A protein has these predicted regions:
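A short, compositionally biased
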Residues: 1, 91-95, 114-119, 289-295, ...
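Short Pro/Gly-enriched beta-strand edge/turn motifs at strand-loop
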Residues: 78-82, 277-280, 377-379
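Extended helical coiled-coil dimerization/tether regions that scaffold
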Residues: 208-315, 426, 437-441
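Electropositive, glycine-dotted interaction segments
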Residues: 108-263
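Switch/communication elements of ASCE P-loop NTPase nucleotide-binding domains
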Residues: 1-70, 293, 297-436
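Short acidic/polar mixed-charge low-complexity motifs
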Residues: 13-15, 103-107, 117, 129-131, ...
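Conserved P-loop NTP-binding catalytic core
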Residues: 33-55, 59-118
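Short beta-strand segments that buttress and anchor functional surface loops
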Residues: 96-101, 123, 298-300
Length: 441
């Protein structure tokens, strides 16, 4: 779960800016909060909503978190490192830090970097009162300089740790190198890395999730849950199933095929999903190198005869396909401790669907399970304090300097109709236009 994120000199964010999902003192919607159980614990919100006008920078908040995730996982994408360009800050370091909770522990992981690579990197174990260093890294012309907190193990463990530390290249995170080279002595690093790799899932408008039928195949309970959600969202789709297709009908590159076939190990059948020609396909590989290809299709029911009619997903609307991407997410959130960030949740969908997705998520919350759903949106009907808490809402607005600024709805202490107040511009984060009479065209 994300507690807070801090950004500086990245994308449209100039000065140090913070977004927080630490729960305030409000007693509203108690199920929306993972409450602190011990004195040093931190209470965290299970939902977050980010509003802003077009080009306000709300997507950049999620992009910056995604960038840190990518670097933490071992991939430094130079093309995605973009410092703030509307001031003399392009030569300064960019900074992103995330404080997060996983497996009952809270961490602060962050770094400073330029297009050329990482300049500083750190990981601390934190609670409401203290910070405990795991490691701090500074990259100089002479290489890496490290300090470590308590290291468990013998001298051999310590020597391996130092070797990994000093041989970590500037375009790679120590977090990923420690795990890749099977480091020992600082197991909290592995816990933090696992959260970035498996616990944090980010969805952009162009992201295609693994299809519903790929996840529910051979699982009757999940199939029933999927059919229930399809009916609830009134898609007209009664089911989504896998259908075998001919290999000659798939334009499959040799590199992708080699990658797929290489996954079969230990005499076991292996399945993996891959996007080919814009379509999500499932490849089932046996131990002998043979394989079959499947695609998912939507099943409708003829209302007159009751017979099933099968449609390619290309025949479905963009909104239906977008919704089909979100159903696996809702199932994942209900069953596992995972955190989802979605950019523009309402893209291609009816405004009411965003509300229903949020209501569906809230209905499945359980006090003992730490999950989190954070998304950006324009949908003002969600600004309803009967549905959400004020501290779950953030507004992003650009100032006169072109830089994005973040403000929490809780700072306004709203009591009135929040939706109406937002549309009237009381909280900012909406577009303002000159009178149409001034338009020269």
């Amino acid at each position: 779960m994300i507690l807070r994120a801090t950004f500086e000199n990245i994308y449209s964010i100039k000065d140090e800016t913070q977004i927080s999902f630490v729960a305030g003192k409000s007693n509203a919607h108690p199920s929306h909060v993972s409450r602190a159980e011990k004195r040093d614990d931190i209470s965290v919100l299970k939902a977050g909503i980010v509003y802003g006008a077009n080009a306000s920078g709300k997507s950049n908040v999620i992009k910056a978190i995604a960038l840190l995730q990518q670097i933490a996982n071992g991939n430094f994408p130079q093309s995605k490192v973009e410092p703030f360009k509307l001031a003399d800050t392009e030569e300064k370091n960019s900074k992103v830090e995330i404080e997060f909770k996983t497996k009952g522990k809270c961490f602060a992981y962050g770094m400073e970097f330029t297009v050329g690579g990482i300049k500083e990197e750190w990981l601390f174990e934190i609670n409401s009162r203290t910070d405990k260093e795991v490691f701090t890294r500074k990259v100089t012309d002479d290489g890496n300089e490290f300090t470590f907190g308590k290291v468990d193990g013998n001298e051999e463990t310590s020597m391996l740790l130092k070797f990994i530390a000093h041989s970590t290249p500037s375009d790679s995170s120590f977090l990923s190198e420690y795990v890749r080279r099977n480091g020992k002595g600082l197991e909290t690093i592995r816990m933090a890395k696992n959260w970035f790799a498996d616990g944090l899932k980010i969805i952009f408008p162009s992201t295609r999730l693994q299809g519903i039928s790929f996840l529910t195949e051979n699982n009757d309970e999940l199939q029933e849950t999927t059919r229930s959600l399809l009916a609830y969202f009134n898609t007209g789709i009664s089911d989504v199933r896998l259908y075998k297709i001919k290999k000659e009908d798939v334009n499959l590159s040799s590199d992708l095929l080699d990658n797929i076939l290489s996954k079969a190990k230990n005499g076991k059948t292996y399945s993996m999903a891959a996007t080919v020609g814009g379509e999500m396909l499932l490849f089932e590989v046996n131990a002998n190198g043979g394989y079959e290809i499947y695609k998912q299709k939507a099943v409708h029911r003829n209302l007159t005869s009751g017979t099933e009619v099968v449609f390619d997903l290309s025949e479905e609307s963009d909104g239906s396909i977008r919704l089909l991407d979100f159903i696996p997410m809702l199932i994942d959130l209900k069953q596992n401790e995972v955190d989802y960030l979605i950019d523009e949740i309402d893209r291609s969908m009816h405004p009411m669907l965003s509300q229903k997705i949020l209501e569906c998520y809230f209905s499945g919350l359980e006090s003992g399970r730490d999950t989190q759903l954070i998304f950006s949106t324009h949908e003002c009907n969600l600004l309803n304090l009967d549905l959400i808490r004020a501290d779950e809402v953030w507004f992003v607005e650009k100032g006169k300097d072109g830089a994005s600024h973040l403000t929490s709805l809780a700072e306004f202490k709203p009591r009135e109709d929040v939706r109406k107040g937002y549309l009237l511009g009381r909280y900012g984060a909406i577009p303002f236009f000159a009178p149409i009479s001034q338009l020269k065209w």
